[in-house]
């Protein structure tokens, strides 16, 4: 059960700390990758040359890599004698040689203590953990993605739990009739309304794409079409499943994960992962890929007695 002894506010509006959520945020492969580095030329010099060196770096901007802009250009350190010295990223290793940089410095009247290769983080950090580790290698900029910050109220978690229990019952009943024992619901937290509930119907309809998620998305579309055709007020049209929450018994397959992405959902919550066919916790990580034009939050691991499904089944 969801914990309710949480906040100073009323139980309904109280926010639940993330540590008390009954599920865990699924991080993308980019958020869990280990430190990867790229070699760059670093120049070490006294602070009095800072203006000339930074101007020089600007002049050779064509030799820079935009992919390294997350690395702070300059860092301050103390030498063996306790004196302040500056270190600056000149350019990637392949762009110039140390001799070329040294010759340019000599022409500009810059005295460098040392020009050396150094491995800096190759990618920007996406999590607190990555930031703390990578920033110790070389200072990097980090801005927590606003879409990664989520809030659940006690009422909302209880409501989602109730929806999930109904889904488990529906999936179990469907399984007894020869279908794959999984189910999905689409929920609007802003109106506290369940817009669609569906089970898998591949066997019943003799159609391999009638997965529970695709059926639920279709029901939302039909509901919205009917509302538009019969409305008498000036209410706005809903764009697909924008900002909605999807609750499932099992991890969706790649097709359904993409269907949810195209439908512009805000978040997905499910109990059990499908390690061989899932589109979320696999390397696909479809819910949060930088190269796609939409991303949604995904949570899993809610310990509920969902029907058992073979690992090679595409949910």
Swiss-Prot record:
Heterodimer with Tad2. It comes from Schizosaccharomyces pombe (strain 972 / ATCC 24843). Its main location: cytoplasm. Gene3D superfamilies: Cytidine Deaminase, domain 2. Keywords: Cytoplasm, Metal-binding, Nucleus, tRNA processing, Zinc. The gene is tad3. Zn(2+) binds at residues 211, 253, 256. One of its GO terms (biological process) is tRNA wobble adenosine to inosine editing. This is tRNA-specific adenosine deaminase subunit tad3.
């Amino acid at each position: 059960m969801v914990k309710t002894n949480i906040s100073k506010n009323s139980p309904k509006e109280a926010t639940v700390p993330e540590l008390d959520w009954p599920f865990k945020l699924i991080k993308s492969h980019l958020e869990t990758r280990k430190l990867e580095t790229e070699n760059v030329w670093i120049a070490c010099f006294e602070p009095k040359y800072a203006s000339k060196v930074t101007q020089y770096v600007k002049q050779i901007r064509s030799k820079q890599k935009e992919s390294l802009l997350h690395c702070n250009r300059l860092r301050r350190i103390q030498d063996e004698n306790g004196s302040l010295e500056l270190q600056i990223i000149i350019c990637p290793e392949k762009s110039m040689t140390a001799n070329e940089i040294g010759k340019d410095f000599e022409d500009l009247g810059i005295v460098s203590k040392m020009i050396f290769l150094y491995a800096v983080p190759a990618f920007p950090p996406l999590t607190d953990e990555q930031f703390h580790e990578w920033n110790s290698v070389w200072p990097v900029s980090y801005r927590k993605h606003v879409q990664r910050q989520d809030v659940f109220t006690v009422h909302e978690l209880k409501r989602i739990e109730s929806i999930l229990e109904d889904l488990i019952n529906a999936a179990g009943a469907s399984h007894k009739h020869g279908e794959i024992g999984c189910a999905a619901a689409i929920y609007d937290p802003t109106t506290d309304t369940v817009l669609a509930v569906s089970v898998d119907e591949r066997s019943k309809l003799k159609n391999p794409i009638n997965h529970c998620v695709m059926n639920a998305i279709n029901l939302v579309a039909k509901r919205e079409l009917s509302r538009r055709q019969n409305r008498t007020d000036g209410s706005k049209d809903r764009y697909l499943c924008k900002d909605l929450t999807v609750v499932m018994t099992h991890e969706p397959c790649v097709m359904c994960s993409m269907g949810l992405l195209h439908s512009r959902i805000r978040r997905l919550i499910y109990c059990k992962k499908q390690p061989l066919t899932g589109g979320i916790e696999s390397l696909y990580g479809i819910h949060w890929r930088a190269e796609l034009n939409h991303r949604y939050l995904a949570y899993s691991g809610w310990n509920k007695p969902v029907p058992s499904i073979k690992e090679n089944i595409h949910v």
